[in-house]
Amino acid sequence: MTAATQFDQVSIVKRANVYFDGKCVSHTVLFADGTRKTLGVILPGALNFGTDAPELMEVQAGQCRIRLEGSDEWKTYAAGESFSVPGKSRFDIDVIETLDYVCSYL
């Protein structure tokens, strides 16, 4: 496997992060430099998330539409694309096809 498809020399938090009655499940990945990411799956449906820190969401598989707080515009994202969400904000996500994602906390 290449560096683009895996993370090496990391720690994984065993307990899953489960949100919205299991519609979103992720695991936290801890890096030696103190950074963290979550790897997760969101099932089809419409959800609203809040953020503490700014986030970069990288879509690994699936498709979704995103609307950032304060915007009327929906944008569509698919595998290989990413979007950023400001810290201390909210966003709507409409998952069209089961979403496999990596979330980086910036």
Curated annotation (Swiss-Prot):
Q: Where are the transmembrane segments?
A: none
Pfam families, A to Z: Ppnp (PF06865)
Please write the reaction equations for the catalytic activity of this protein: a purine D-ribonucleoside + phosphate = a purine nucleobase + alpha-D-ribose 1-phosphate; adenosine + phosphate = alpha-D-ribose 1-phosphate + adenine; cytidine + phosphate = cytosine + alpha-D-ribose 1-phosphate; guanosine + phosphate = alpha-D-ribose 1-phosphate + guanine
Show the GO MF annotations. guanosine phosphorylase activity; purine-nucleoside phosphorylase activity; thymidine phosphorylase activity; uridine phosphorylase activity
InterPro entries noted in UniProt: Ppnp, RmlC-like_jellyroll, RmlC_Cupin_sf
Q: Which CDD domains match?
A: cupin_PpnP-like
GO CC aspect terms: cytosol
| Entry EC no(s) | 2.4.2.1, 2.4.2.2
Keyword Glycosyltransferase set for record: yes
- Keyword Glycosyltransferase on this protein? yes
Q: Which UniProt keywords apply?
A: Glycosyltransferase, Transferase
Q: HAMAP family per the record? A: Nucleos_phosphorylase_PpnP
The record's section on PANTHER family has: PYRIMIDINE/PURINE NUCLEOSIDE PHOSPHORYLASE, PYRIMIDINE_PURINE NUCLEOSIDE PHOSPHORYLASE
Role this protein plays: Catalyzes the phosphorolysis of diverse nucleosides, yielding D-ribose 1-phosphate and the respective free bases. Can use uridine, adenosine, guanosine, cytidine, thymidine, inosine and xanthosine as substrates. Also catalyzes the reverse reactions.
* Protein family (similarity comment): Belongs to the nucleoside phosphorylase PpnP family.
Name of the molecule in the record: Pyrimidine/purine nucleoside phosphorylase
Provenance organism: Paraburkholderia phytofirmans (strain DSM 17436 / LMG 22146 / PsJN)
Top-level taxonomy: Bacteria, Pseudomonadati, Pseudomonadota, Betaproteobacteria, Burkholderiales
